């Protein structure tokens, strides 16, 4: 099953230097999930080759315009294209009033069902689940209500060691219990077997955390622990620590420190200030603290493989 993150937009407040406001697409298996929807997201979909008709869930972190000004356009385009499937939006509660006002002024009644799920920035909770993944909110420290999102792959059942089963002449009727991780006792002979004797560890479940916008805040470290891929606010270089504090954003050193303390596999830095035409200074500073850091360059897809020692970059 694939697990990829495509960067659609990674700049902060305004488009600049060919970079666009925040948006990402997470692809897990054949399902696409949109995180944030800044201005110009639809055009970036076309540039990045995103099959955006397959997006059924949209997650909006907060209501600063660079994270949602592209949303009403996307909602309207789905209507014009006669979308049939329901569209779920997970976002701060006031966004529903904004959407309804825009649709009302335009005298538009959507041809598909829009299901709105208000998020709570004061508590971390499970907000979405299907057969493959869960999505939890992350409490972020910003000027207004803001949540990050943690995508977790569900742990697969243990794999049956068929050779061992046959070696001990064990009926496959015991497979359901073994897959749950339980030990078994054979009804036929009374003989007991530990689960470890008859099963193989499943592949480690993968995870992706999106933390933007936020000030440096170690209270979320427990939730980020051992995440395969972390995207973290990195608006300023290390000299901008006071400006970051004033605006509730993060510097290179702070983002890298979060990654290091959380023991993540890989760090993506983004939400770059428009003051930087060259992002190399940000990358270099972050790598001084956490070596396995990449820039969230638009159009790049980051693949999280089954064995997560390395996160592959797909051009």
Residue ranges with predicted function:
Residues 119, 123, 216-315:
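Binuclear metal-ion centers of metallo-dependent hydrolases, dominated by the metallo-beta-lactamase
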Residues 107-119:
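A glycine-rich helix N-cap at a beta->alpha junction
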Residues 5, 36, 45, 62, ...:
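Divalent metal-coordination and catalytic microenvironments
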Residues 1-50, 84-86, 149-151, 158, ...:
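Conserved beta-strand hairpin/beta-sheet module of binuclear metal-dependent hydrolase folds
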């Amino acid at each position: 099953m694939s697990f990829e993150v495509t960067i659609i937009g990674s700049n902060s407040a305004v488009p600049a230097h060919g970079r666009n406001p925040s948006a990402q697409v997470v692809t897990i298996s054949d399902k696409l999930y949109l995180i944030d929807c800044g201005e110009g997201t639809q055009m970036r979909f076309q540039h990045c080759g995103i099959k955006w008709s397959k997006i059924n869930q949209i997650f909006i972190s907060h209501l600063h315009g660079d994270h949602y000004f592209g949303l009403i356009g996307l909602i309207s385009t789905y209507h014009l294209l006669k979308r049939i499937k329901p569209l779920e939006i997970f976002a701060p509660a006031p966004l529903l009033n904004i959407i309804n006002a825009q649709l009302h002024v335009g005298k538009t009644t959507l041809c598909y069902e829009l299901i709105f799920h208000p998020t709570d920035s004061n508590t971390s909770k499970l907000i979405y689940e299907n057969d493959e993944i869960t999505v939890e909110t992350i409490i972020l420290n910003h000027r207004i209500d803001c949540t990050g999102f943690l995508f977790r792959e569900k742990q697969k059942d243990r794999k049956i060691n068929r050779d061992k089963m046959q070696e001990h002449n064990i009926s496959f009727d015991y497979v359901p219990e073994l897959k749950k991780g339980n030990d078994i006792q054979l009804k036929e002979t009374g003989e007991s077997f530990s689960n470890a004797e008859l099963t193989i560890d499943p592949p480690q479940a993968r995870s992706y955390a999106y933390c933007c916008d936020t000030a440096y805040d170690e209270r979320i470290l427990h939730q980020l622990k051992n995440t395969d891929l972390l995207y973290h606010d990195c608006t300023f270089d290390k000299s901008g620590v006071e400006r970051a504090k004033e605006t509730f954003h993060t510097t290179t050193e702070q983002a890298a420190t979060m990654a290091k303390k959380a023991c993540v596999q890989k760090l993506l830095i983004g939400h770059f200030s428009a003051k930087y035409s060259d992002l190399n200074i940000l990358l270099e500073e972050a790598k001084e603290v956490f070596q396995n850091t990449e820039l969230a360059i638009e159009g790049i897809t980051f693949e999280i493989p089954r064995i997560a020692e390395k996160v592959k970059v797909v051009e």
